[in-house]
Amino acid sequence: MTLIKSISGIRGTIGGHVGEGLNPLDIVKFTSAYATLIRKTTTVKSNKIVVGRDARISGEMVKNVVCGTLMGMGFDVVNIGLASTPTTELAVTMEGACGGIILTASHNPRQWNALKLLNEHGEFLNKEEGNEVLRIAEAEAFEFADKIGRAHV
């Protein structure tokens, strides 16, 4: 099992023990850290986060965990389903969203998946933002919402 945590996202082989592979608990942890960062830094008035994914066999499970976590953190989720990285990036700006998550491990083998994190401009997080997501996740310093978000398709 492999879990790689970097400023460009969280990627790994699906399954395994916490911290050793990309399993549902790790997905919740890093999605919650990302949601906390977005809540602190966005200048967009929207409460939406776009989620798109590739066709990997684990994609449906990862999408469900990510979307449920984002809603639990108080964000409205725009699930665009199967979508390329550029399509998801563009959807962030077209939806007026405060961020986006692309579920794809790109060139990695099929047993891998990843969370690629976008800002309100549909761009990958910069080094400082990526490091802050990792810091929040490590400290479990999440900021929870008073109200649950909704899902949009």
Sequence positions of predicted segments:
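Generic alpha-helical secondary structure signal
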Residues: L25, P86, K127-N131
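An N-terminal, well-structured beta->alpha segment
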Residues: M1-G68, G72-M73, R150
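Gly/Ser/Thr-enriched, mixed-charge loops and adjacent short helices
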Residues: T13, N113-H152
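Pocket-edge positions in alpha/beta enzyme catalytic cores
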Residues: G19-L22, I80, G122-L125
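Alpha-helical scaffold segments in soluble metabolic enzymes
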Residues: K29, A33-T36, T87-L90, E132, ...
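Ferredoxin-reductase
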Residues: T43-H121
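Short, surface-exposed, polar/charged, turn-prone segments marking secondary-structure boundaries
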Residues: S32-Y34, V77-N79, S106, K127-V133, ...
